[in-house]
């Protein structure tokens, strides 16, 4: 293949000059002398010069260094050999367990499946988390976004979903850590190891200490591995933490490439980059990819271009609220803001739909009454409104739930609640079956039986 030499280095962006008759194509991978650093061609500037992004540190590089054109895009290992392993953006093992020993490598830039090949599914994916199963049910083979500001529990919710779904789900999982904390990646690895499901998970990390090129491409590396499993006819779970960091890496790269920024300083190609990634995360007639993505919301502003661009690609959106977290209700999922395309009586059935809408109606009415309560107090409300407030406060508390992954912090064992039990419990609260129970009994419990036990214990305590 042709070779060129470095003519300019600006941070993570490197210009390489090639003979004019053998200029590399856009997205071709270039190998630098010494073989440690890979570059990816982003632009052809003319006169045989290409502008590239470094997939790794640019420390110690200098002008004149030779670069070899591989003639093809970055390719990564795919197939069952990747399971139980931690890899970087180039598919190199970083877990000190020796070579991957892959039989096949796929390019990370691929076309999305054609419209005729795609397949939709109406099957529900039970998560064991009450508020999600009731208000924003997940579809098997669908895309889910966990939206939240800093510190409201995106990663903990993601870990609980992995714990509940990946362990119950007999299929394979791919976890892409995009620009998140290395500590969380480490915790995830040992969590999977302890649960004996490590041999079903492939992990790809490009964490926040890495250059923007790595963070921009690591999501594609993870997705390529998931696509291979899907095309073999398997059902795959793809976890991405965090999609916002993918956008942010794109912003950094875009600025380094000299593009004019658009709204709020984001790259002008924001919608296109997001589309290229999201359109590939889809289920086909051969197999399915169910994707769960954490989305950081800058300054808790859901209208920010990055989360706003992500919204349109998702089947279900789980919105985490700082107000709910400040009340000590975890998971801090907002039942009035979270939505799902599956919340349709034709998909989930009349009973589930009516209970979910009933819960939302009661909570919405309580939200409207809060101003009156703040000014005039509870006594000024009608009897009907007092009943609504009482039930809403019980529902609010009953939407909380102890998590398995938080056991080490809270000391209380995690609870998995089946969908059937969730629907029956909330239907009982709406029908007034538990009006005589104190609202404290509903806080941090699994099923309704546990709340009844708590209420009994409280009564006995008062009796003494």
Curated annotation (Swiss-Prot):
Swiss-Prot/TrEMBL keywords: ATP synthesis, ATP-binding, Cell inner membrane, Cell membrane, CF(1), Hydrogen ion transport, Ion transport, Membrane, Nucleotide-binding, Translocase, Transport
Substrates-to-products reaction catalysed: ATP + H2O + 4 H(+)(in) = ADP + phosphate + 5 H(+)(out)
EC category: translocase
Superkingdom of the source species: Bacteria
PROSITE patterns (UniProt xref): ATPASE_ALPHA_BETA (PS00152)
Topology with respect to the bilayer: Peripheral membrane protein
GO MF terms held by the record: ATP binding; ATP hydrolysis activity; proton-transporting ATP synthase activity, rotational mechanism
Subcellular location: Cell inner membrane
UniProt: ATP binding residues: 148-155
EC number per UniProt: 7.1.2.2
Cellular component GO terms held in the UniProt record: plasma membrane; proton-transporting ATP synthase complex
Keyword Cell inner membrane: yes
Family, as annotated: Belongs to the ATPase alpha/beta chains family.
HAMAP family: ATP_synth_beta_bact
Subunit (UniProt): F-type ATPases have 2 components, CF(1) - the catalytic core - and CF(0) - the membrane proton channel. CF(1) has five subunits: alpha(3), beta(3), gamma(1), delta(1), epsilon(1). CF(0) has three main subunits: a(1), b(2) and c(9-12). The alpha and beta chains form an alternating ring which encloses part of the gamma chain. CF(1) is attached to CF(0) by a central stalk formed by the gamma and epsilon chains, while a peripheral stalk is formed by the delta and b chains.
Function: Produces ATP from ADP in the presence of a proton gradient across the membrane. The catalytic sites are hosted primarily by the beta subunits.
Descriptive protein name: ATP synthase subunit beta
Organism: Marinobacter nauticus (strain ATCC 700491 / DSM 11845 / VT8)
């Amino acid at each position: 293949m042709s070779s060129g030499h470095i003519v300019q280095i600006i941070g993570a962006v490197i210009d390489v000059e090639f003979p004019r008759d053998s200029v590399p194509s856009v997205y071709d991978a270039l190998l630098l002398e010494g073989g440690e650093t890979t570059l990816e061609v982003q632009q052809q500037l003319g006169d045989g010069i290409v502008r590239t992004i470094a997939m790794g540190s640019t420390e110690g590089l200098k002008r004149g260094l030779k670069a070899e054109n591989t003639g093809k895009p970055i390719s990564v290992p795919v197939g069952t050999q990747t399971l139980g392993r931690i890899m970087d953006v180039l598919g190199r093992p970083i877990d000190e367990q020796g070579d991957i020993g892959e039989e096949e490598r796929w390019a990370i830039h691929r076309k999305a499946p054609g419209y005729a090949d795609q397949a939709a599914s109406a099957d529900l994916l039970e998560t064991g988390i009450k508020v999600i199963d009731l208000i924003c049910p997940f579809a098997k083979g669908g895309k889910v976004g966990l939206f939240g500001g800093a510190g409201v529990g995106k990663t903990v919710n993601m870990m609980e979903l992995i714990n509940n779904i990946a362990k119950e789900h007999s299929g394979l999982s791919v976890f892409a850590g995009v620009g998140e904390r290395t500590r969380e990646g480490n915790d995830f690895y040992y969590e999977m190891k302890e649960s004996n499901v490590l041999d079903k998970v492939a992990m790809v990390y490009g964490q926040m200490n890495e250059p923007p090129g790595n963070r921009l491409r690591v999501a594609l590396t993870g997705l390529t591995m998931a696509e291979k499993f899907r095309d073999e006819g398997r059902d795959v779970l793809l976890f991405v933490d965090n999609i916002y960091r993918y956008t942010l890496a794109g912003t950094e790269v875009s600025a380094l490439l000299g593009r004019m920024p658009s709204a709020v300083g984001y790259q002008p190609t924001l919608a296109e980059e997001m589309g290229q990634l999201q359109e590939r995360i889809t289920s086909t007639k051969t197999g399915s990819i169910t994707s769960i993505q954490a989305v950081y919301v800058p300054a808790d502003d859901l209208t920010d271009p990055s989360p706003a661009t992500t919204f349109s690609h998702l089947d279900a959106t789980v919105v985490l609220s700082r107000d709910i977290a400040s009340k000590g209700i975890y998971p801090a999922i907002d039942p009035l803001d979270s939505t799902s395309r599956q919340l349709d009586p034709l998909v989930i059935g009349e009973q589930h739909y009516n209970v979910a809408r009933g819960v939302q109606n009661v909570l919405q009415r309580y939200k409207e009454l809060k101003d009156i309560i703040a000014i005039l107090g509870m006594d000024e409300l009608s009897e009907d409104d007092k009943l609504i407030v009482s039930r809403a406060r019980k529902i609010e508390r009953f939407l909380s739930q102890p998590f398995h992954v938080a056991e080490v912090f809270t000391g209380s064992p995690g609870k998995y609640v089946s969908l059937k039990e969730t629907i029956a419990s909330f239907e009982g609260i709406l029908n007034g079956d538990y009006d005589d129970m104190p609202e404290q009994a509903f806080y941090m419990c699994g099923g309704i039986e546990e709340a009844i036990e708590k209420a009994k214990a409280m009564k006995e305590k008062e009796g003494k």
